[in-house]
């Protein structure tokens, strides 16, 4: 991790480290202690805020809300025990075919 850039892999490591901290000192730990439903709720809120910022004209707001969204996604993935490499593998699988083929191949629920 460089001082001016944090990758998603860095964020995954930061969340994992902060998950081990005391809840009084770590927002990440306190969020995880509230359970998966709260983590999912926060992710949803940040997704909406990002979408709303995107329809506005303030690029800085989009950047800020996207950072919040990515953080809350990293927390949710950690809470579910999903590693970023697993998401990368799924993205690789999907990019081996066209978007229409990939969508058609998903199981309907």
Swiss-Prot record:
Gene3D superfamilies referenced in this protein's UniProt entry, alphabetically: MazG-like (1.10.287.1080)
Superkingdom in the source lineage: Bacteria
Cystine residue pairs: none
Annotated localization: Cytoplasm
Entry keyword set: Amino-acid biosynthesis, ATP-binding, Cytoplasm, Histidine biosynthesis, Hydrolase, Nucleotide-binding
GO biological process, one term: L-histidine biosynthetic process
Segments passing through the bilayer: none
UniProt pathway annotation: Amino-acid biosynthesis; L-histidine biosynthesis; L-histidine from 5-phospho-alpha-D-ribose 1-diphosphate: step 2/9
Reactions that this protein is recorded to catalyse: 1-(5-phospho-beta-D-ribosyl)-ATP + H2O = 1-(5-phospho-beta-D-ribosyl)-5'-AMP + diphosphate + H(+)
Range of residues in the leader sequence: none
Protein name per UniProt: Phosphoribosyl-ATP pyrophosphatase
């Amino acid at each position: 991790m460089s001082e001016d850039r944090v990758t998603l892999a860095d964020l995954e490591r930061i969340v994992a480290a902060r998950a081990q901290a005391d809840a009084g000192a770590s927002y990440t730990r306190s969020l995880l202690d509230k359970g998966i439903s709260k983590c999912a709720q926060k992710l949803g809120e940040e997704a909406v805020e990002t979408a709303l910022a995107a329809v506005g004209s303030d690029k800085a707001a989009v950047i800020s809300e996207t950072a919040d969204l990515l953080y809350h996604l990293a927390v949710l993935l950690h809470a579910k025990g999903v590693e970023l490499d697993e998401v990368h593998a799924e993205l690789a699988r999907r990019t081996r075919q066209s978007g229409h083929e990939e969508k058609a191949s998903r199981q309907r629920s």
